[in-house]
Amino acid sequence: MLIKAYAKINLSLDVIGKREDGYHLLKMIMQTIDLYDLLNITPIEKGIEIKCNKSYIPCDKRNLVYKAVELFASNYGIKSGVSIDIIKNIPVAAGLAGGSSDAAAVLKVMRDIYIPELEYKDLIKLGTSIGADVPYCMIGGTALCQGIGEKVTSISSFKNHILVLVKPFFGVSTAEVYKSLDISKIKIHPNTDILINAINSGSLLKVSKNMKNVLENVTLKKHPLLRKIKNELIDFGALGALMSGSGPSIFAFFDDMLKAQICYDKMKTKYKEVFITRTV
């Protein structure tokens, strides 16, 4: 069974508090984009076999796909195994939920194969224990995500909008970014209600002008190159640019494919991982 596991971007990301266990409380708008990994999933007699086209991707228990299979099997008493070939296209450590999306896709397939009667809310609860982005990745589309990310509410679709995405040569540790974040020093928070109204109106310009990610306070300060990338994208005619997740990927919306293509072509000469795609 060949399936797609889509990347996500954050149209907004706000940190509104911190739980006693150290997890940060979030309020964010997530959006699926047409950039995806391919997973070829085959049931086998026993065990978990994972292969990947990228040599730097671990194929053992460090991989969220492995964790997803192991967790599902142990929770529901599945004795047979699974073989998974991953064709990795989503950049890693990029703020695009590549690993979480792969894990979410595998959980959905495991459910369909072994326990199709399993309610989605139970599958989502299982996914939360793997990673905070996994519940959203199971649902996808345009959604308001709250709590640590596990409370997902679908909102009006914001699909088919053009964007250019740049992932610089380095990765970022999500844990380190949150560890460095001082909530008391966040001066301007995203206005989520205004952003949702902009999404409801279908206005790409209004959405672009109201995007905000408070984690930029940490990641852009540590990596000034990201601010340069944002400015470059705007100079090419983007309506707005933002860092996705904890970074370092930067995306920008365009209302004209020609402008986006020119931007893509120029950025591709400077940065290795550049994509031109759409929201889905």
Swiss-Prot record:
SUPFAM superfamilies on file: GHMP Kinase, C-terminal domain, Ribosomal protein S5 domain 2-like
Pathway(s) annotated for this protein in UniProt: Isoprenoid biosynthesis; isopentenyl diphosphate biosynthesis via DXP pathway; isopentenyl diphosphate from 1-deoxy-D-xylulose 5-phosphate: step 3/6
Segment forming the signal sequence: none
GO molecular function: 4-(cytidine 5'-diphospho)-2-C-methyl-D-erythritol kinase activity; ATP binding
Positions that bind ATP: 91-101
Reaction catalysed by this enzyme: 4-CDP-2-C-methyl-D-erythritol + ATP = 4-CDP-2-C-methyl-D-erythritol 2-phosphate + ADP + H(+)
Keywords tagged on the record: ATP-binding, Isoprene biosynthesis, Kinase, Nucleotide-binding, Transferase
Origin superkingdom: Bacteria
Similarity-based family: Belongs to the GHMP kinase family. IspE subfamily.
Role description: Catalyzes the phosphorylation of the position 2 hydroxy group of 4-diphosphocytidyl-2C-methyl-D-erythritol.
Protein's recorded name: 4-diphosphocytidyl-2-C-methyl-D-erythritol kinase
Organism: Clostridium kluyveri (strain ATCC 8527 / DSM 555 / NBRC 12016 / NCIMB 10680 / K1)
